[in-house]
Amino acid sequence: MTSIAFWNAFTVNPFPAAARRSPPPLTPFTSGALSPARKPRILEISHPRTLPSFRVQAIAEDEWESEKKALKGVVGSVALAEDETTGADLVVSDLKKKLIDQLFGTDRGLKATSETRAEVNELITQLEAKNPNPAPTEALSLLNGRWILAYTSFAGLFPLLGAESLQQLLKVDEISQTIDSEGFTVQNSVRFVGPFSSTSVTTNAKFEVRSPKRVQIKFEEGIIGTPQLTDSIVIPDKFEFFGQNIDLSPFKGVISSLQDTASSVAKTISSQPPIKFPISNSNAQSWLLTTYLDDELRISRADGGSVFVLIKEGSPLLT
């Protein structure tokens, strides 16, 4: 908008009355200096004052409106992304809960019916499609730690889990896998418990990262843990046997001696070192594909397509 000149206050003297009655005759303009009597006053003009530019303000307001719209768009996009993330988390959490519910009572898959296996496989497939870490070997810190086997379709474990002759003496209490991402080691362990003892069989292996999802495992040695015998055997003073009351109080001294002997033997055996043996046959290598991984659940597939569902030690999913 063009600036408007503001004229400062100035004085104009009126002509005398006689002059107004008889104005002087007009004469042609001639070059040269004007006479002092007719020389016009030079009007003093102050510096022009620029009025506010409404156009600039309007443009600024338009830009601010555009910025506000852009900010609203960003906020809306963030809110939408947060809603989508929250929704995805809820879906994954619901799928994990359903999976754990399906695994209940299956004895790590040994007692699962064909219908249950189908439902478990469907839930596993859905979780794999929503894997929050599609490149698990690039998130080795999540792989770190001790993982408890909750389910497997690996038929090679079923004879171990279901052998009736073995269950009369020992029962498989826990199968676990411990991963050390800094040392690139894997330790697989099976713990057995019996009436008066417990023991474990462990394999130690090294692993190499072969792809974002796959690791190659090479087993190096096996370890048979020394049986941990119960160091105290409690024999009651009285008990009922086929309807007849048996009183052992007269033999209390003998029983105490037996308990002390059992405790001594248990401590002696338990203090012995474990038995180690090398693993060097052609079956000492395998690969493992991690298809789902978060901070409490891992799903892996091995040679032949066998699936393993493992839960991180300390996770609420174990309770």
Curated annotation (Swiss-Prot):
GO cellular component, one term: chromoplast
Plastid listed as a keyword: yes
Record keywords, A-Z: Chromoplast, Plastid, Transit peptide
Cellular compartments annotated: Plastid, Chromoplast
PANTHER family named in the record: PLASTID-LIPID-ASSOCIATED PROTEIN 4, CHLOROPLASTIC-RELATED (PTHR31906)
Family, per entry: Belongs to the PAP/fibrillin family.
Protein name per UniProt: Chromoplast-specific carotenoid-associated protein C1, chromoplastic
